[in-house]
Amino acid sequence: MRNLILLVIFSTVSLFTLADDKGFTHYKKGEYSKALKIWTEEADNGEANAIYNIGLLYFFGNGVNKDLSIAYNYCKRAALKGLARAQNNLAYMYLNGMGTNKDYVNSYAWSLIAIKHGYNSQGIKDNAKIHLTPAMLTDAERLANKMIKEIKK
């Protein structure tokens, strides 16, 4: 079941935004090092989708050693740039302790942020909420509101 959820959350369909992206072209051919090189250049220029895509390479271990901590860091960078699917994936990573410690407050907060930015993160939100006390829920909502104001969208 967990693998099915991972597939849905981190599906290849949501991996890339532009079909004409040169990195995506290399990725489809299995040329992961070429895709990584292109995305690294774009990420160095602050491109959120490139940052996110690098994170997913590390999440799945495509062309790099699988490293959930590195994946988490890239995902968080993209999430802070306003990329809703990165916000959703970050919420998932907090929920399950993938690349970071389990943190239901952050999971709930990031799912709220993703929802605010148009991503359907309701399932993650509901799963995180089960683990929250009323005080923790209030903290998560405050955190989400603070982050929404800080994120450049």
Task: Name the predicted role of every residue range.
Residues 20, 52, 73, 88, ...:
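TPR/TPR-like alpha-solenoid signature
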Residues 12-14:
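N-terminal signal peptide c-region/cleavage motif recognized by signal peptidases
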Residues 20-27, 38, 42, 53-60, ...:
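Hydrophobic face of amphipathic alpha-helices that form TPR/SEL1-like repeat modules
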Residues 120-153:
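Terminal, low-structured helical/coil segments at or just beyond the last alpha-helical repeat
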Residues 27, 31, 44-48, 60-62, ...:
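Short helix-capping/linker turns of helical repeat alpha-solenoids
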Residues 1-4:
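Positively charged n-region of N-terminal signal peptides that target proteins for export
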